[in-house]
């Protein structure tokens, strides 16, 4: 459109003007020319500053009073609307209508005040440069004949878009750098009068140095135009009006209104400055008001759909437009109103006005950009625990909200990876990508599509919470009230929209089509038709479903009604019936009561049928301990999972010393899954969710499923054989401990205790664990490992309530209220269906909080001292009391001098008889006969090694005597019973014994004080033993008990009780007194028994006289005596000792010798070879005993061997025994062949890190495959190894707590004392000790391996140690068979 035909008004951005009340602050250039001559376009001065580099950041708006012009000047009466358009070079529409009001309207509008403020909204320079100077047109149009109209400036947002920035406002070169100074970019002046502004004045202001750069000025008049210097001619002044008047419907729906920042529109809606109802663009944060929260929808804004580019529409203002109301401008920060004439500050690019620079600086800038998850686009700005990962080949990092989003993004970036995740579908059998995985009956089924998933659900009868309309999965309690009851069936929906769609469509959705087709084919279901009839809940009338009115019923579900009146009437009836209390007091059902019962306490109970009455009567026979009746309905338990109350027998879960109760098995299983209650299954040895814990022989065994429990029961019963029974009292599977016949029925029990308790329960002598009443106990439950019996379910529930909340009134009960007064006090009065007059309700009692101040008093206690009379030394009755105090001599003890004020010790001599040896001189002829007697003994060579050794020592003694015979022939000492008295110097008990002698106790018996806890193994349990106890060795015959003579019977005439009592296993301290006392008992019995028979292999022509004092014997004598001792020792009652008991006694003798400074080691030294052979024969016949829990019983423990130095690194043999013991215990080597497979090349040191403490520890590692080889019968099997194809690695962990008993330290010491060339050999591990080596020598061992016989002897002793069976339990090991 030609600009010459209209008078256009254009706002310039950078036109400097003088600040003053007399100047009209306007940028309307060449206004006078438009009135005096033809219409000329307004000259825009923005081109002058188009490429200016002035960094303007803020605008200043001056609000000043406007002077009214003289009334003689004609008034422009049309509403002038000034708009900011976002498009460049917009042409005015030619079809715009002209507004021609009548003269009356013009006269009525004369003098009216119309005040509007124009604020330009500047954007960033980056989007504005390069645009034309007229990209934003301030257009004003009016008909030529219109003269008396007021000017109205309106910012219409219909053509305002943030995406296309107003070039007219932003081409001034204002920068948006954050460090730029705050400068003025816009000034708006409101004045009451308009003065002339010429071009000369505007040009003169260009060169001024102003602190506040004024780049834009807009003048708004509120009265008639005053005198202008060039004169105004209204006939030639035309205003082009481009307006948009939305319809009433569009304004109401979208909330579009005029853009009046900081003012109130005509409708009265509040808009703070800078607000716009339609700023739905990426920069919408600019228009957020400080008076409204940023996360709250502002009034008039219903939708947030962006309207970035709206079409240019021509809207016509109505002829009868009312003038706008006066508005008020407020500060965006402090909300103070801005007065006229006050300077207002404005930030570039923002529509907010501020009263001062302080408010401008303190006002929050653009908020921090939101961080979104790359995959799901979720806001993760404030989220903790986000994941930053570099997922592609580039170096950029992406941020995700969770690991699932990261996985999905990686799969999306790598589509080839998803091709590898193909499996075969369980339903259709296709090899494709899997969408669903269902874990059902301990198996994972993979399904490729929803169709296969629905077919799988229907085939297995699985019920899932899915929306009936869209098929979305619903949680158990997340459906809310979105439930419809149609023909008695509940249909669940995810939201209300799905409910509406379901009611409108009336048919099933597409995702259930396959399921419905399958059900129709299988069960001949009739398909539901569109618009089916539904029964009204109130009047039971058949109506179409989509015509029904839905309402939430009393049960929480949506119920259909035919009309609102029917719904209200049904609610009224239900409210009346609900107030009557028709809930059955027994089954809790909402039904019409058929029976009523009046209780002794005046309460009225309702019942739905006779069955509930009978059950209630049976329960009401029980009374509470205080004699008051307690109704069963008053006892409610709370489920620990769903938090619902219930009054049935609970499901119990005992975990971590806490007992949890649940209303059903389902809640119990869900609770285990939710709280991750996992444990190692006793059968499959895998960590899974706990299914059940069952007692086996008193030991709790956890299982992951019912199948593992049954399989373990079968294995357990197969191990115990015929002795495996189920206890009739505690119901555990165990070995038969007791049997009782009751009324002709033989019942088995695990112990005598269970037998006695069952007998009490059977004869109704047991008491209820809740009310303490005797009688018939119908209910029982296992509580914390004990069986609890109760009268009925009522007492059972009370017991659980007491465990949850202890009630002191229920802790004690009467002796027997059941048979005394319980029946009389709990009788009910049946009145049929007619209700009796309601009794007076009892007064409701509530707890009342009262402000009470406690009264405190101080109580003093007076203690009167008790006076006693004490005599002193001045009295006549004083007498000195002598107390004997033994003091060892010649130790000197200083005696303090108290000047006779206290008692002092006085030394007193006591004569003690001391035996003195007397040396009698022998005649010459007698001494000459001694060598002849020695030669005669030598001629009688005996096959016994002991006799030969004794003869050798005798010969040595005779040679020493022969040397001294020439000097002093009278000093020859003759002993007829024992020879070699010079060897006794190392065993003098008077000088070197540091352990006290043990007094003889004839009744002391190790097997009585430390009894066995189980019977020995029989033939059916021989498979539990390692081969060393079975086929590798033949059982050695044990000598029978010999008949006692008269003297022996006199000595051992006492009798002791049998050791067959079933006592539980306990830790028994090691005492050497048992071994020393057994030696004395054997020596005393041997001396008294004249008819004692010796074994054939130990017969000799010369006997050694044995003494009760062990320290008085030489090495040869002890070897001889101990060899006889282990074969002839008997218990005080005449029975044989068990092999482990004999080994225990010998260990006690060894400790006594070591404690008495005797250097002999009866188990290692070569001088005790005969004793070692006899002991090994006896130990080979040992058969281990199995305890009820499946462990091995033995009286020998590992700590005993360390105490008596059988294990350690102090000698070569002890170090070998230590390595042999550790390999047997930790590597599980139970046969000689397994030990022979060990070598230096297969055992190596390894560092292992603890995952909890992150600490490195050394360990010895050994691979099982190297042990197993090709011998299947010698495979090492442990409890943790369940698959034969696995090759577990056995380790010996470093003992940092006690380095002296560390396996790794012992192995390093063994390597250091071995030859260096043997470290990598694969055929030897146990080396032969050097005969001449000492403890200080660098090498203790030779390169020769130990022979098999020595290893067998070592293994026999090691297998008697109880500690080696702690890890590998042979009774309960599944792989031993």
Curated annotation (Swiss-Prot):
Residues 1039-1050 have a biased composition (Basic residues). GO terms for biological process: negative regulation of DNA-templated transcription. There is a cross-link at residues 48, 88, 98, 104, 147, 253, 297, 312, 325, 348, 366, 417, 441, 491, 503, 513, 529, 532, 576, 603, 649, 658, 688, 700, 709, 764, 788, 812, 829 (Glycyl lysine isopeptide (Lys-Gly) (interchain with G-Cter in SUMO2)). Residues 139-152 have a biased composition (Basic and acidic residues). GO terms for molecular function: ubiquitin conjugating enzyme binding; zinc ion binding. The modification Phosphothreonine is found at residue 1376. Signal peptide: none annotated. A zinc finger (MYM-type) spans 327-363, 369-409, 421-456, 463-502, 533-570, 636-671, 723-758, 764-799. InterPro entries: DUF3504, TRASH_dom, Znf_MYM, ZnF_MYMT-QRICH1. Keywords: Chromosomal rearrangement, Disease variant, Intellectual disability, Isopeptide bond, Metal-binding, Nucleus, Phosphoprotein, Repeat, Transcription, Transcription regulation, Ubl conjugation, Zinc, Zinc-finger. Pfam families: DUF3504, zf-FCS. Its main location: nucleus. This is Zinc finger MYM-type protein 2.
């Amino acid at each position: 459109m030609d600009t010459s035909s209209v008078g256009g008004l254009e706002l310039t951005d950078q036109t400097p003007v003088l600040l003053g009340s007399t100047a009209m602050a306007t940028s309307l250039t060449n206004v006078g020319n438009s009135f005096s001559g033809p219409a000329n376009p307004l000259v825009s001065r923005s081109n002058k500053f188009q490429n200016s580099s002035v960094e303007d950041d803020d605008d200043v708006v001056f609000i000043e009073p406007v002077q009214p012009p003289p009334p003689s000047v004609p008034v422009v009466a049309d509403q002038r609307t000034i708009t900011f358009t976002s498009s460049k070079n917009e042409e005015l529409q030619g079809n715009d209508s002209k507004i021609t009001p009548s003269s009356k309207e013009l006269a009525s509008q004369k003098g009216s005040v119309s005040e509007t403020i124009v604020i330009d909204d500047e954007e960033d320079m980056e989007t504005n440069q390069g645009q034309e100077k007229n990209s934003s047109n301030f257009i004003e149009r009016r008909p030529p004949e219109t003269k008396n109209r007021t000017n109205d400036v309106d910012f219409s947002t219909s053509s305002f878009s943030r995406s296309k920035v107003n070039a007219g406002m932003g081409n001034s070169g204002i920068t948006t750098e954050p460090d730029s100074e705050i400068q003025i970019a816009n000034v708006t002046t409101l004045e009451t009068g308009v003065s002339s502004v010429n071009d000369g004045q505007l040009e003169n202001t260009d060169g001024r140095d102003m602190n506040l750069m004024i780049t834009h000025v807009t003048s708004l008049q509120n009265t008639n135009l005053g005198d202008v210097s060039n004169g105004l001619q209204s006939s030639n002044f035309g205003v082009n009006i481009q307006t948009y008047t939305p319809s009433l419907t569009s304004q109401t729906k979208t909330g579009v209104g005029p853009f009046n920042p900081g003012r109130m529109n005509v409708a009265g809606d509040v808009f703070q400055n800078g607000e716009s109802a339609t700023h739905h663009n990426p920069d919408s944060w600019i228009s957020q008001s400080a008076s409204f929260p940023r996360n709250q929808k502002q009034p008039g804004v219903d939708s947030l759909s962006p309207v970035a580019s709206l079409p240019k529409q021509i809207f016509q203002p109505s002829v009868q437009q009312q003038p706008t109301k006066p508005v008020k401008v407020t500060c965006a920060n402090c909300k103070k109103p801005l007065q006229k004439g006050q300077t207002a500050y404005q930030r570039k690019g923002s529509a907010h006005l501020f009263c001062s620079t302080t408010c401008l600086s303190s006002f929050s800038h653009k908020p921090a950009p939101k961080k979104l998850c790359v995959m799901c686009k979720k806001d993760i700005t404030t989220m903790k625990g986000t994941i930053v990962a570099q997922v592609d080949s580039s170096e950029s990092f992406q941020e995700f909200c969770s690991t699932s989003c990261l996985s999905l993004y990686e799969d999306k970036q790598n589509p080839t990876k998803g091709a590898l995740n193909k499996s075969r579908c369980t339903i259709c059998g296709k090899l494709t990508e899997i969408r669903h995985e269902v874990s059902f009956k301990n198996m994972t089924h993979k399904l490729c599509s929803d169709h296969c998933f629905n077919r799988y659900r229907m085939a297995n009868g699985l019920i899932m919470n899915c929306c009936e309309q869209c098929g979305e999965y619903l949680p158990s309690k997340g459906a809310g009230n979105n439930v419809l009851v149609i023909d008695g069936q509940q249909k669940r929906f995810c939201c209300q929209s799905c409910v509406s769609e379901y009611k409108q469509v009336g048919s099933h959705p597409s995702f259930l089509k396959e399921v419905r087709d399958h059900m129709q084919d299988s069960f001949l279901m009739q398909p539901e038709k569109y618009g089916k009839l539904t029964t009204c809940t109130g009047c039971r009338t058949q109506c179409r479903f989509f015509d029904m009115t839905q309402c939430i019923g009393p049960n929480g579900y949506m119920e259909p009604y035919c009309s609102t009146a029917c719904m209200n009437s049904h609610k009224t009836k239900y409210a009346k019936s609900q107030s009557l209390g028709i809930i059955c007091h027994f089954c809790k059902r909402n039904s019409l009561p058929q029976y009523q019962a009046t209780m002794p306490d005046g309460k009225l109970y309702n019942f739905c049928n006779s069955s509930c009455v009978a059950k209630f009567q049976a329960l009401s026979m029980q009374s509470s301990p205080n004699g008051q009746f307690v109704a069963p309905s008053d006892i409610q338990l709370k489920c620990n999972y769903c938090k619902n109350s219930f009054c049935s027998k609970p499901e119990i879960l005992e975990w971590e010393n806490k007992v949890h109760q649940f209303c059903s098995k389902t809640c119990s299983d869900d609770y285990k899954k939710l709280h991750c209650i996992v444990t190692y299954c006793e059968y499959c040895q895998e960590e899974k969710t706990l299914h059940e814990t069952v007692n086996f022989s008193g030991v709790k065994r956890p299982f992951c499923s019912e199948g593992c429990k049954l399989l373990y029961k079968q294995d357990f019963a197969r191990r115990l054989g015929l002795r495996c029974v189920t206890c009739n009292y505690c119901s555990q599977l165990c070995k038969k401990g007791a049997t009782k016949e009751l009324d002709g029925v033989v019942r088995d029990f695990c112990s005598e205790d269970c037998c006695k308790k069952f007998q009490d329960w059977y004869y109704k002598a047991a008491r209820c664990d809740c009310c303490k009443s005797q009688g018939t106990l119908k209910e029982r439950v296992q509580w914390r490992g004990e069986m609890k019996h109760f009268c009925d379910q009522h007492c059972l529930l009370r017991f659980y309530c007491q465990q949850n909340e202890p009630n002191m009134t229920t802790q004690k009960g009467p002796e027997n209220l059941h048979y005394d007064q319980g029946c009389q006090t709990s009788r009910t009065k049946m009145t049929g269906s007619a209700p009796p007059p309601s009794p007076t309700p009892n007064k409701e009692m509530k707890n009342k909080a009262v402000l009470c101040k406690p009264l405190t008093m101080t109580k003093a206690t007076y203690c009167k001292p008790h006076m006693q009379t004490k005599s002193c030394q001045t009295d006549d009755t004083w007498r000195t009391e002598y107390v004997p105090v033994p003091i060892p001599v010649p130790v000197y003890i200083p005696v303090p001098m108290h000047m006779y004020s206290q008692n002092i010790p006085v030394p007193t001599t006591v004569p003690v008889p001391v035996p003195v040896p007397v040396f009698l001189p022998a005649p010459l002829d007698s001494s000459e006969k001694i060598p002849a007697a020695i030669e005669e003994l030598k001629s009688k060579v005996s096959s016994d090694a002991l006799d030969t050794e004794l003869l050798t020592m005798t010969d040595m003694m005779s040679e020493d005597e022969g040397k001294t015979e020439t000097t002093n022939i009278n000093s020859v000492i003759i002993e007829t019973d024992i020879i070699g008295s010079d060897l006794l110097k190392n065993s003098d008990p008077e000088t070197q014994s540091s352990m006290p002698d043990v007094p003889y106790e004839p009744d002391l018996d190790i097997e009585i004080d430390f009894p066995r806890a189980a019977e020995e193994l029989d033939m059916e349990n021989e498979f539990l033993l390692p081969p060393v106890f079975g086929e590798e060795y033949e059982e050695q015959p044990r000598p029978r008990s010999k008949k006692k003579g008269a003297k022996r019977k006199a000595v051992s005439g006492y009798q002791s009780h049998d050791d067959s009592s079933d006592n539980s296993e306990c830790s028994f301290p090691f005492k050497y007194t048992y071994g020393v006392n057994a030696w004395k008992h054997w020596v005393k019995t041997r001396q008294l028994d004249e008819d004692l028979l010796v074994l054939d292999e130990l017969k000799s022509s010369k006997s050694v006289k044995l003494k009760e004092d062990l320290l008085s014997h030489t090495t040869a004598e002890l070897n001889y005596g101990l060899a006889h001792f282990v074969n002839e020792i008997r218990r005080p009652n005449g029975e044989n000792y068990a092999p482990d008991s004999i080994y225990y006694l010998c260990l006690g003798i060894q400790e006594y010798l070591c404690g008495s400074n005797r250097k002999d080691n009866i188990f290692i030294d070569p001088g005790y070879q005969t004793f070692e052979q006899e002991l090994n024969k006896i130990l080979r016949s040992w058969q281990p005993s199995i305890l009820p829990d499946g462990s091995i019983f033995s009286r020998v423990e590992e700590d005993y061997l360390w105490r008596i130095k059988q294990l350690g690194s102090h000698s070569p043999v002890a170090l070998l025994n230590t390595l042999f013991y550790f390999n047997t215990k930790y590597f599980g080597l139970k046969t000689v062949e397994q030990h022979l497979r060990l070598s230096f090349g297969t055992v190596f040191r390894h560092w292992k890190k603890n995952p909890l403490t992150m600490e490195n520890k050394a360990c010895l590692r050994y691979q099982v495959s190297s042990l197993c080889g090709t011998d299947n019968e010698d495979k090492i099997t442990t409890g943790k190894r369940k698959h034969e194809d696995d090759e577990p690695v056995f380790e010996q962990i470093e003992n940092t707590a006690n380095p002296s008993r560390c396996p790794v330290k012992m192995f390093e010491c063994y390597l250091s004392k071995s030859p260096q060339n043997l470290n990598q050999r694969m055929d030897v591990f146990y080396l032969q000790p050097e005969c001449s080596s000492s403890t200080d020598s660098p090498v203790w061992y030779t390169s020769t391996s130990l022979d098999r016989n020595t290893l067998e002897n070592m293994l026999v002793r090691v297998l008697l140690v109880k500690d080696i069976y702690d890890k590998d339990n042979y009774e309960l090991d599944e792989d031993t068979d």
